[in-house]
Regions:
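Conserved Radical SAM active-site core
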Residues: 11-75, 81-97
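Conserved beta-strand->loop/alpha-helix structural units within folded catalytic cores of enzymes
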Residues: 1, 40-45, 50-53, 149-150, ...
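Hydrophobic side chains within well-formed alpha-helices
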Residues: 87-88, 281, 305
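Radical SAM enzyme [4Fe-4S]-AdoMet core and its adjacent flexible, acidic
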Residues: 5-20, 26, 37, 66, ...
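Local cysteine-cluster metal-coordination motifs and their immediate loop/turn environment
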Residues: 1-6, 262-265, 303-314
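Short, flexible loop/turn elements at secondary-structure junctions
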Residues: 46-48, 78-80, 107-109, 151-153, ...
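Cysteine/selenocysteine-centered motifs that mediate thiol-based redox chemistry or coordinate metal-sulfur cofactors
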Residues: 286-334
């Protein structure tokens, strides 16, 4: 939870807040099926916590019903503040063997004091209680639901990374099992697309991982994941390594108003391709505007919102992605 959320602002990054209409969402899912779209996963989160949506379980069920065989898994990213037992039951009921569910809990703290400092409110005990309930009920019901607990290393919480690892690896080691794939994710802090402070944040991350000997691999019944690479191709101390950003190919975002965004890092929504209430996904995603932006990157031109961004570094732009964009550009006469 960042300041725009806990302070109740009307807008986040110049985008008016709101809930995705269930009827519109259903039409969008139908459109994805009609366009024969397939995804590795679908994340229910962008510029807000999905647990705020009153119909979250319904959205999960609709996606599972319509995208079965077209998506590897569904993913919900949440702080768990608004997920008491009755709402956790709705999430548990949405998990299915053919469309597994991953719930990512963003915690970033081990003590109440640090949680309040990082998150903006004193809610750690409530959050832990909600998560423990989910873990316990998952075991009782044998639900195909995996869990990831995240810790974003930053000034003010880095001293708690070791305790965080110990607490949750012990709990999941006891309440988890081989039928699930649970993870503890230690993430680097992202500073404005690689803006001033990013390199310092990366150094703090690396120092913290070394200090507590946190390494990728199995620990008890949980998989520990770390970020080995910088989050951005360029940042305040690294320049000249910029290449075509993979976000333009593999991170489409459907905003709550139905607009299709081209990149998950475009927080101000400058790369809107149009509304999925009026157009098909492929029509927009493979259209002139999207293809032109990809070709700009391939040629080394980073304009508009991309000029001030360091370029996503946690995915890779492959040769096949470049080739597909070039072929599409030729077909469109660009």
């Amino acid at each position: 939870m960042c300041a725009p959320h806990h302070e109740g602002w009307d807008q986040i990054h110049d985008v008016s807040k709101g809930f995705l209409d269930v009827d519109l969402y259903t039409r969008i899912m139908d459109g994805l099926v009609n366009d024969d779209c397939q995804f590795d996963h679908i994340i229910f989160q962008w510029l807000g916590d999905p647990s705020l949506h009153p119909d979250l379980p319904a959205l999960l069920n609709i996606a599972a019903d319509k995208m079965g065989g077209r998506v590897g898994y569904l993913r919900v990213d949440t702080n768990a503040i608004r997920l008491p037992p009755d709402r956790m039951e709705g999430i548990l009921a949405a998990a299915r063997p053919d469309v597994p569910l991953l719930v990512v809990f963003t915690l970033d703290a081990h003590t109440a004091e640090t949680y309040t400092k990082v998150k903006g409110q004193d809610a750690l005990e409530r959050v832990r209680r909600n998560i423990r309930y989910l873990i316990r009920r998952r075991k009782e019901l044998a639900v195909p639901l995996n869990i990831q607990l995240q810790f974003v290393v930053q000034p003010g919480n880095d001293h708690e990374a070791g305790d965080f690892l110990q607490y949750w690896s012990d709990l999941l080691g006891c309440q988890g099992g081989e039928q699930w794939h649970d993870e503890l994710m230690f993430k680097r802090l992202s500073v404005g697309g690689g803006a001033v402070g990013q390199a310092a944040a990366d150094r703090l991350y690396e120092k913290t991982m070394k200090r507590f000997d946190i390494q990728a691999g199995k620990r008890g019944g949980v998989e520990v994941n770390v970020w080995g690479s910088r989050p951005w191709q360029d940042d305040d101390e690294h320049d000249g390594g910029r290449s075509a950003c993979p976000g333009l190919w593999i991170t489409p975002v459907i905003r709550h108003d139905g607009h299709l965004m081209m990149c998950c890092a475009d927080l101000r929504g400058e790369l809107s391709l149009g509304s999925l209430a009026e157009h098909g996904f492929r029509e927009l995603w493979e259209g002139k505007a999207a293809t032109q932006k990809r070709m700009e990157h391939i040629s080394g031109r980073f304009e508009g919102v991309c000029e001030g961004c360091g370029g996503i570094n946690w995915y890779e732009t492959t040769d096949s992605m470049v080739s597909s964009a070039q072929k599409r550009a030729k077909a469109l006469g660009l």
